């Protein structure tokens, strides 16, 4: 039986990620969340070049230049009686694979929507991913300090496009220059907004009760009447908050505010710690593992190279699923069947590292990795099980990487293999020639690869177009048929970074014809790590 202190530690944990379309304000909201967790004293706004106060979570050189989050940062902070683990995910179009894998390591998501735009393409894609595991979702309608779309319309759009019921928890009073604050439906309180307080925690004036004459005085008679009318309509037409439906991923509580003005973020955080689940069970190939089990298990969902420019290292991010990590404990790496002693695991505050003595289910720890750990690796205290559901996606874009200095072929290969293990890009080595082909989900990834090859491996490379339109991982239980397939299709076959056989098709037509010609061969669009 697990002891009470251990169970208390588990029940305190909340592990969540923020999902949004680029520029909906995700990095800003991350900053403000950390400010409330007292992790940083003054929030640095994400700005273009030239501003020296960069956001805490965008710490890689290229991110600083471009003002976008490229790699997933992990931050832990206390809030109310809980310990919150926040995984910041790249909102930029090109990093969906990294984002996707991060969503396998959380128990809850916060969806940030730009209220002037509504539901955007990237948000739709990410919501599809959360659907695969029915992850509970909280929603923050951002940018109330600008002119926004009608709030009822915004909620309707979320319901119809994302197929999730909305339950408003707070309701906005005006917007743009006329934004006065929000009314908290569950608390029956109005919180008034002050401008110019974005970098600190606001002490909002609170007015109790919707019929309080103080409210009319504070926001003006017209807005007060409008607020009461709107609320009558909203409460009649929207869903009441239902905790079971929220945990099942069927209903989302909706909060309104402005991350830049640091208003409304605390209401969302209050909801998160109150309603989001403590660390959830995870499925393995053998059985389900629950958080309260006493033996340690965990899985690697991301590898980050060179978190410390001073040290040429890589760090594997591991989500603790059950048991407790103790400094110096011996763990079993299931894939390699080797035991390793972990004495220097890290916790993170986006790029600042500190060594950790203990970690509990729901926590994310960093393991130093000298090329022996891969994405999807399971660590246990001896049990031979493997966590499932951490996929690799077939890339959609391909380029050939070419060296400016042909003598650096060895460094190039080393750099590309490391970047592919980290999941930044996928590398394919064709069987028929010495080309190196990289595959990505978005164009920006190629720029990142070239920049990192130069900055971290001192390799000057350029990429050029290549006649590949899609890739599929190939499997066949019949050895003889697989050998025949390989012999006849060598010019279209390659090995990926993990030496898995891959069919690289010049066109979709070619892929479909090959499929018909070889019915015994399986072509997979995703591959479990």
From Swiss-Prot:
GTP binds at residues 20-27, 88-92, 142-145. PANTHER family: PEPTIDE CHAIN RELEASE FACTOR RF3. Pfam families: EF-G_D2 (PF22042), GTP_EFTU (PF00009), RF3_C (PF16658). InterPro entries: EF-G-like_DII, EFG_III/V, G_TR_CS, P-loop_NTPase, PrfC, RF3_C, RF3_dom_3_sf, RF3_GTP-bd. It comes from the Bacteria. GO terms for cellular component: cytosol. This is Peptide chain release factor 3. Keywords: Cytoplasm, GTP-binding, Nucleotide-binding, Protein biosynthesis. Increases the formation of ribosomal termination complexes and stimulates activities of RF-1 and RF-2. It binds guanine nucleotides and has strong preference for UGA stop codons. It may interact directly with the ribosome. The stimulation of RF-1 and RF-2 is significantly reduced by GTP and GDP, but not by GMP. Belongs to the TRAFAC class translation factor GTPase superfamily. Classic translation factor GTPase family. PrfC subfamily. PROSITE patterns: G_TR_1 (PS00301), G_TR_2 (PS51722). Transmembrane segments: none annotated. GO terms for biological process: regulation of translational termination. The gene is prfC. It is found in: Cytoplasm. GO terms for molecular function: GTP binding; GTPase activity; guanosine tetraphosphate binding; translation release factor activity, codon nonspecific; translation release factor activity, codon specific. Residues 11-280 form the tr-type G domain. It comes from Proteus mirabilis (strain HI4320). SUPFAM superfamilies: EF-G C-terminal domain-like, P-loop containing nucleoside triphosphate hydrolases, Translation proteins.
């Amino acid at each position: 039986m697990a002891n009470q202190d251990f169970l208390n530690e588990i029940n305190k944990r909340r592990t969540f990620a923020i999902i949004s379309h680029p520029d909906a304000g995700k990095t800003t909201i991350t900053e403000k969340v950390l400010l409330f967790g007292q992790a940083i004293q003054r929030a640095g706004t994400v700005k273009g070049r030239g501003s020296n106060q960069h956001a805490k979570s965008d710490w890689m050189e290229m991110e600083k230049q471009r003002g976008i989050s490229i790699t997933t940062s992990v931050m832990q902070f206390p809030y109310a009686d809980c310990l919150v683990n926040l995984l910041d995910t790249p909102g930029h179009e090109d990093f969906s694979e990294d984002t996707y894998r991060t969503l396998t390591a959380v128990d809850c998501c916060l969806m940030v929507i730009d209220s002037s735009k509504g539901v955007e393409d990237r948000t739709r894609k990410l919501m599809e991913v959360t659907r695969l595991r029915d992850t509970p979702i909280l929603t923050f309608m951002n940018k109330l300090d600008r002119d926004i779309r009608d709030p009822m319309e915004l909620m309707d759009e979320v319901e119809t496009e994302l197929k999730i019921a909305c339950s408003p928890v707070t309701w906005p009073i005006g917007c743009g220059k006329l934004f006065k604050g929000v009314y908290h439906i569950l608390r029956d309180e109005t919180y008034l907004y002050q401008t110019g307080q974005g970098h600190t925690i606001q002490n909002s004036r609170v007015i109790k009760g919707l019929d309080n004459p103080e409210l009319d005085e504070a926001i003006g008679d017209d807005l007060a009447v409008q607020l009461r009318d709107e609320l009558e309509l909203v409460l009649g037409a929207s869903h009441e908050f239902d905790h079971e439906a929220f945990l099942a991923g069927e209903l989302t509580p909706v909060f309104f505010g402005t991350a830049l003005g640091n208003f409304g973020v605390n209401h969302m955080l209050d909801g998160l710690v109150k309603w989001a689940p403590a660390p959830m069970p995870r499925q393995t190939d053998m059985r389900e593992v629950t958080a309260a089990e006493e033996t340690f298990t965990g899985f690697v969902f991301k590898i980050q190279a060179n978190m410390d420019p001073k040290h040429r290292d890589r760090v594997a991010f591991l989500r603790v699923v059950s048991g407790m990590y103790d400094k110096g404990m011996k763990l079993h790496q299931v894939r390699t069947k080797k035991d390793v002693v972990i004495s220097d695991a890290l916790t993170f505050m986006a790029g600042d590292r500190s060594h950790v003595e203990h970690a509990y289910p729901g926590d994310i720890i960093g393991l130093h990795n000298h090329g022996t750990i891969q994405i999807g690796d399971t660590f246990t205290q001896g049990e031979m099980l493997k966590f499932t559901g951490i996929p690799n996606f077939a890339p959609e874009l391909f380029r050939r990487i070419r060296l400016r200095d042909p003598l650096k072929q060895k460094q190039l290969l080393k750099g590309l293999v490391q970047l592919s293990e980290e999941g930044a890009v996928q590398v394919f080595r064709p069987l028929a020639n010495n080309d190196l082909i990289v595959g990505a989900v978005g164009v920006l990834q190629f720029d990142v690869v070239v920049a990192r090859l130069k900055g971290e491996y001192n390799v000057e490379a350029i990429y050029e177009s290549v006649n590949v339109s899609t890739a599929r991982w190939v499997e066949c239980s019949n050895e003889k048929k697989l050998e025949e397939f390989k012999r006849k299709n060598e010019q279209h076959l390659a090995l990926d970074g993990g030496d898995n056989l891959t069919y690289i098709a010049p066109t979709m037509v070619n892929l479909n014809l090959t499929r018909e010609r070889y019915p015994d061969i399986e072509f997979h669009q995703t591959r479990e790590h």
